[in-house]
């Protein structure tokens, strides 16, 4: 098989390993007894696909209703679960309206009902309901700056949680029914609190942490945002629910797909083709252009010295690189930045082939 075709096949295998139609059904609970309701809610770039998997495998005679929010262009025609498209990675009014409707539905559940939450990457912006005193335009302004300053996604989400009525465990706190959150991870470490800003997860971060992040990256925040965070840090506003809070006794967060699962699937493709796969890890972080330079150095050493691995070899990794955006009109994202940096450093070295892509199909402002 030609190198280009092999790279594409490996990536397709990685995507298939996280395909909701294959991984969601095995995790679905039974319908509640005594006629209780099952409400499905979700947010993220995989929300529609996850909801479709639920519909396909839910008993036809059992009640099922719900609402999921996904990125523009990612919606699917569902029959029992409503699907709404909204803004990503910058939140918008449509997302706020949909989230308000979603929260109202969750609050209508009782102890005999059940909530299935479908959580995936991108949920932080799609599940947006600004806290009291915060306007959507304020949230947009802060989000845009955080996304372009080089902050890690974990840091960005700490700020988001403390400007939200639903993230950072607040969705779980608003629900009286048992909750099963099925989560597709897109973050290093696979911690549910960082995936879609953890709507059903305990939040160990604080208002003071959020303020420190804004200061660290010199974010020019609207007055309303600073006022809320400062009030929270002073104890004048309730914190997000923390680990050990009783609200999580009725909530299970279950990570059903991870970056490591996808890397393993990609590695199997190379093994079958007679290429030695080396998984470097699923937690690669740093500026994408700098990571590209490091990978170029490793690659050149292998090509020149056949060490520490003898070619043919495939270096496989995943993670959450960052990009500091200097031109707001720029295009692309971390994958294209990584590849460009890699290509420049390799300087047309022969026998080297590379692919970098996101399993969700989106690289920054562009499709893969």
Please state what every model-predicted region is.
Residues 1-39, 48-61, 90-111, 257-261, ...:
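N-terminal glycine-/serine-/threonine-rich phosphate-binding loop
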Residues 41-42, 67-70, 117-121, 147, ...:
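Short beta-strand segments
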Residues 53-63, 80-83, 107, 130-141, ...:
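A glycine- and small-aliphatic-rich helix-loop capping segment at beta-alpha/alpha-beta transitions
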Residues 69-111, 154-155, 159-160:
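Glycine-rich oxoanion-binding loops at beta->alpha junctions
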Residues 104-194, 199-202, 218:
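Glycine-rich, mobile lid/loop segments that gate access to catalytic sites or pores
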Residues 134-151, 203-218, 328-354:
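Gly/Ser/Thr-rich active-site loops/lids in small-molecule metabolic enzymes
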Residues 180, 202-294, 301:
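Accessory alpha-helical/coil subdomains and C-terminal extensions
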Residues 280, 289-293, 304-305, 311-312, ...:
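Extended C-terminal subregions enriched in glycine
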């Amino acid at each position: 098989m030609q190198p280009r075709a092999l790279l594409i096949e490996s990536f397709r295998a990685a995507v298939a390993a996280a395909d909701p139609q294959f991984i969601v059904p095995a995790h679905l609970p039974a319908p509640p007894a005594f006629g209780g309701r099952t409400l499905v809610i979700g947010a993220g770039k995989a929300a529609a696909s996850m909801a479709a998997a639920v519909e396909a495998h839910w008993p036809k005679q059992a009640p099922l209703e719900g609402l999921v929010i996904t990125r523009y262009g990612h919606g699917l025609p569902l029959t029992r679960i409503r699907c709404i498209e909204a803004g990503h990675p910058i939140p918008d009014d449509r997302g706020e309206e949909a989230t308000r409707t979603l929260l109202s539905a969750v609050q209508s559940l009782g102890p005999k009902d059940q909530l299935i939450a479908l959580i995936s990457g991108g949920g932080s912006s799609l599940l947006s309901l600004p806290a009291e005193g915060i306007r959507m335009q304020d949230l947009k302004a802060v989000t845009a700056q955080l996304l372009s300053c080089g902050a890690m996604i974990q840091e960005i989400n700490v700020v988001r949680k403390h400007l939200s009525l639903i993230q950072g465990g607040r969705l779980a706190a608003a629900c009286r029914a048992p909750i099963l959150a099925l989560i597709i991870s897109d973050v290093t470490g696979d911690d549910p609190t960082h995936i879609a800003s953890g709507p059903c997860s305990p939040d160990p971060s604080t208002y003071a942490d959020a303020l420190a992040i804004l200061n660290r990256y010199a974010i020019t925040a609207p007055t309303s945002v600073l006022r809320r965070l400062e009030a929270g840090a002073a104890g004048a506003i309730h914190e997000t629910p923390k680990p050990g809070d009783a609200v999580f006794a009725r909530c299970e967060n279950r990570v059903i797909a991870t970056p490591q699962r996808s890397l393993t699937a990609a590695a199997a493709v190379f093994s079958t083709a007679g290429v030695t796969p080396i998984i470097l890890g699923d937690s690669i972080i740093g500026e994408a252009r700098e990571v590209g330079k490091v990978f170029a150095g490793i690659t050149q050493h292998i090509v020149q010295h056949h060490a520490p691995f003898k070619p043919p070899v495939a270096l496989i990794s995943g993670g959450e690189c960052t990009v500091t955006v200097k031109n707001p009109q720029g295009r692309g994202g971390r994958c294209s930045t990584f590849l460009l940096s890699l290509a420049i450093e390799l300087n047309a070295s022969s026998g080297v082939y590379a692919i970098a892509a996101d399993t969700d199909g989106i690289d920054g402002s562009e499709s893969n």
